[in-house]
Each structure stands twice: as C-alpha cells, then as structure tokens.
C-alpha cells in the first residue's frame, strides 16, 4: 500500500464527524441532528453520510450554520447554544426548531450569512 492510499480520506466519515462535532457545540443531540438531515440517529452512529446525498447536503448546510455562528460570536460556545435556543424575530422562530425543516434551515443560514456580511 502506498502512502497516498494510506492517507486517503473517506469523505462520508469526515462529514459525519464534522456534523457530530458541530451538533455537540450547538447543544444538539444525535436525535436532533437526525431530524435535521432526515435520518435516524442510528445512521449517525454507523459513521457515514455521503456528501452528495440529500442528507449529506443538509448536513453541509448545518455545518455552515455552525461556522457562521462561530464567526459571529467569536467561537463562544455558550453564546452559540444560547442563540440557537432563543426566539429570533428576524428568522421568525427558535433556530433550534427552525433548522429541522429545509426551509427553516435555509432561512437561519441566510440570516447568519447576511449578519456575517455586516462584519
């Protein structure tokens, strides 16, 4: 086996790890994450989400939410969790609930991207 083969990255495994890490920081359970990406929480335990799948696309959007929020609050994890659980007049609800639908997830992400643009 060559060195290149030994270091080949499995994108599906990396995506699950990134999703689980983002969810942990945002105060989300595996059940919550499963609701966002449309999979049972047991699917997350198996450790693979194909990036090109519908679930993979939703996982990538949630990771973008995490990254945008991280920038806005300077990485303060307590503030990130607070923001997710606080009613937001601009997004029209609780972000932690809104992200469980595709429309809500995109609304929250668009809001965060717009706020980041003001920095």
Regions found by a protein language model. Name each.
Residues 1-119:
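Non-transmembrane "mature" sequence context
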């Amino acid at each position: 086996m060559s060195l290149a083969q030994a270091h080949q990255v499995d994108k599906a495994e990396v995506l699950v790890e990134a999703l689980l890490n983002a969810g942990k920081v945002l105060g989300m359970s595996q059940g919550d994450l499963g609701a966002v990406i449309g999979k049972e929480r047991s699917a997350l335990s198996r450790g693979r989400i194909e990036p090109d799948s519908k679930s993979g696309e939703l996982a990538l959007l949630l990771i973008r939410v995490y990254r945008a929020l991280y920038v806005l609050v300077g990485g303060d994890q307590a503030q990130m969790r607070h923001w997710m659980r606080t009613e937001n007049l601009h997004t029209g609800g609780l972000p932690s609930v809104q992200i469980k639908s595709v429309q809500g997830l995109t609304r929250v992400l668009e809001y965060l991207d717009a706020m980041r643009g003001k920095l």
